Amino acid sequence: MELLKRKENTNLTEKVLQFGEGNFLRGFADWMIDRLNKEYNWNGGVVVVQPLASGLCDKLNEQDGLYDLYLRGLKNGNRVEETRVVECITRAINPYEDTDGFFACAENPDLRFIISNTTEAGIEYIQGQKYGDFHNSTFPGRLTMFLKKRFDAGLGGFILLPCELIDKNGDKLKECILKYAAEWLLGDDFEHWICEENYFTNTLVDRIVTGYPRDTAAEMEQSFGWRDNLIDTAEIFHLWVIEGDKALAEEIPFHKIGLDVLWTDDVTPYKMRKVRILNGAHTMSVLAATLAGLETVADMMADQVVSGIMHRGIYDEIIPTLDLPESKLLQFASDVAERFKNPFIKHYLLSIALNSVSKFKVRVLPSILEYIKRFGKEPANLMFSLAALIMFYRTDEAQDSPEVVEFMRSASPAEILSREDLWGEDISFLLGSVEKYIAAAEKLGVKQAMADLAKEQK
């Protein structure tokens, strides 16, 4: 079979510079842009820049920027599978080998958007780096150099859409760039241009992208009729929340083709929704599920007792503590349940259980505390999950820092709950319920204790 390549030259206008050529952006942002081109005639090409010295640029260029994307999951309870060739990437640049080619993009007046996914550690400022030393600079440092080229060319700024999974990713990126501009003495006019001509948006991205399907790639290539070294796979669900001027949405109108891209004045409530409902549901349920002898998220969702405690935790205890419109919370919770039931993804509970103490502090404990604050009583299902956390850390399955594992294994519940450094505050006032649920689980077994808890709430 021949390698996947273009049959004819592309006539796309290069409008997007993308830092990151990995699975996530190709299965998320590039898929959206490809759909916008084909369904709305946006005609936008993506120039991909490789953030690290080693990467996929050569493979992308060998395939003329093309790759197959296979989406699969549940939609309204039905199994859905979709395959498409994504054609929006015009070329890929390895800036370590072609630095001039990278900086030449700054002089393209059609270029309007910068998308990035350089990992959570990518957006950082390190003092003492030298202007012009591309190879030894951070991503924000390189971007500062790129923006200076743009400024010197007398061109307008960009709409920046960072996808790194950190709070206020756009604000942090802008802050780093301004620090480099000041340290490198690039001038007040340039700093003013950064602030006035460029739009740094804060974003929240949500899609599970599972990447290259090693086990089934050969079989998939047979069905395609060509070889593809860059097959990407992802779930059906997608969400991109962008905090920025809603007028900018008209320049990249994903909403016109029904994509779940939301422009808002504040991304925080949506981030809280994701952390509390999606991540919180994982963390509140996987430890009890593991103690009950289950292995995967699919097993957990198929078990009525375990999935029941998660369902009641989400709908009766987490959602009432959140302030978005109820319809948006209920729809997201419904989507989460479908995502957890995805028959195409084998998600092991123990992989989710990694570092559960710190996860519980961020994902579940705030819901417990807010529930108590609003309703004057403890949320039973979330309290059971806290008891399950303590019991889980007494097993050999717990994976965390050696200090946390050793302490959690040997300490009493009272000692654990009083550790302010673990929880951000002393939560000893929760001890009564925790000890009650631990005693029930030790006497009856975790599964029966959960079943009894369900009966109490009927």
Give a label for each model feature.
Residues 1-458:
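Substrate/ligand-engaging "lid" and interaction regions
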